[in-house]
């Protein structure tokens, strides 16, 4: 009988050093400080000027693209994307540990943006000045959740879906372009400041770096051991085909 865990190779990720924890905390603190500093400067200044400068470059095609990105990478859309990839890994490719690694890593990067939103509580850009194309209000401008998820998705693809150095390099380049496009779409729509999307890239990275040593040193070894023991139990209880 085929071993049930043969399609579920261990998913210990790169960068397992515990030193990543203080590094991630420092990066998080720096990112939050950036947000608080930008908030203290008010809505006027270079941050708003860049948003306003994009108004003249709007076109039906770019507006359609930015609107699609806004919908697809909304909180509900993010959950669908995350669930789809995890189910694909776990059920179709029979890699449950990879599914858990991907889902938890992306979630760590994405949800870390909520820490910034709560602490900074920055008001959205004035829609009248940016001529915002969608309605966004409230004190949750810093950082951008859309951009944070895009960055976290790239981290997940590089660390879990790619396997060789070349694959990771190519995935990183393509993913970097993707994250920048999502970030620019938030500015194009007039619902975020440039510092918001920059902070998203930083705080998402901080969340991923915080999670990696926890996954590699505490969680993955235990899950791998449970999976192997469970697979052996099923294998040993299978009837002998010669009986």
Please place each PLM-identified region on the residue numbering.
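Aromatic-anchored segments of alpha-helical transmembrane domains
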Residues: 30-33, 107-114, 177-187
């Amino acid at each position: 009988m085929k071993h049930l865990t043969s399609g579920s190779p261990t998913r210990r990720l790169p960068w397992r050093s515990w030193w990543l924890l203080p590094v991630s905390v420092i990066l998080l603190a720096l990112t939050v400080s950036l947000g608080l500093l930008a908030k203290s400067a008010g809505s006027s200044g270079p941050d708003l000027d860049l948003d306003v400068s994009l108004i003249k470059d709007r076109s039906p095609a770019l507006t359609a693209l930015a609107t699609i990105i806004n919908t697809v990478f909304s909180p509900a859309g993010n959950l669908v994307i995350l669930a789809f990839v995890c189910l694909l890994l776990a059920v179709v490719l029979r890699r449950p540990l990879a599914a858990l690694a991907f889902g938890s890593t992306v979630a760590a990067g994405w949800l870390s943006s909520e820490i910034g939103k709560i602490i900074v509580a920055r008001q959205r850009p004035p829609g009248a000045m940016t001529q915002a194309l969608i309605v966004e209000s409230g004190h949750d401008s810093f950082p951008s959740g859309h951009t944070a998820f895009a960055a976290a998705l790239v981290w997940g693809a590089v660390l879990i879906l790619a396997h060789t150095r070349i694959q990771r390099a190519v995935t990183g380049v393509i993913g970097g372009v993707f994250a920048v496009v999502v970030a620019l779409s938030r500015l194009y729509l007039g619902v975020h400041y440039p510092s918001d999307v920059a902070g998203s890239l930083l705080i998402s990275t901080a969340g991923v770096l915080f999670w990696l040593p926890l996954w590699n040193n505490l969680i993955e070894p235990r899950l791998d051991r449970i999976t192997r023991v469970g697979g052996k139990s099923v294998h040993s209880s299978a009837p002998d085909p010669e009986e």
